Amino acid sequence: MFAKLENKFNVVDKFNILGTIGLIFALLGIVSVILLPFNVNFFNFDIDFLGGTTMTYDMHTELDKAELDNIAKLVEDASGVAPSSVQKSEGTQVVIKTTTLDTEKRDAVFSALKEAYNLNDGTAKDADGNIIPTDMLSVDNVDPVMGADLRNAAIVSAFLAILCMLIYIAIRFDWRSGLAAIAALAHDVFVVMGAYVVFRIPVNMTFIAVVLTILGYSINATIIIFDRIRENRKVLKKTSFGEIVNKSIWQTATRSLNTTITTLLAVGLIAILGVSSIQNFVIPLIVGIIAGLYSSMFISGPIWAKLIKNSK
């Protein structure tokens, strides 16, 4: 399918352009991370990382986007704090997450929702004199210290995953291929971070699941190409390494593209049919899968070729 492109479009020779394109897409994520130590935050950090209050209510009404937006406005008006997320849960239940609210503000939120949606507060009785259960299902606070612990654990997990991948690739191929793969993985992670900023997706423990999933998906796509490069090196001994890399990329392009399309079809259906909490996982996953396809084809191999060339 892509055999004709092998001679018409040399990926290694075009790396300056392809690498710049990748850098542009990753730039928002890179800048957002760099600015964090300077108290400039573009991310929508959830209470999992910062601490805060989680409130769950049964609204007894269908919760579409308009209703969720209305609930978010009611919460902000009542508490003076914009919620970090308002998500539909089971049935007609809604989960609201904010920065830490004291008892007075939590009561104000419930009063506002009670008035707007005729919620039960646990004092009303039915026709038989039985108390009707309250529609305030739960209120939980996450301590900021616990949030910091979760954040640190997440960073360590991602770092260890990348380190293990680097060691594995360096052993299986060579250390330069390991560096090339890490550069591609970094590209994917920063692109995903940019998606979190653009779509204002809450950054919580789901973020770690997304990142680790993308790392695994991307490294698998990269290893497929690296395997083909290694096999071609055994056969094409008189061919330059750059040409071998280019040939190997286009030889595996059909497989890479088909795998990505198949995965996107499945994940896309989940994004369309799933509730908002699932969509917050799936949307950055879709972005990461596409970024992984790009980096495995147009970043990792060319960087490996450049490192080989510069080491001679």
Language-model features, listed with the residues they occupy:
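A structural signal for conserved, well-ordered secondary-structure elements
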Residues: 1-312
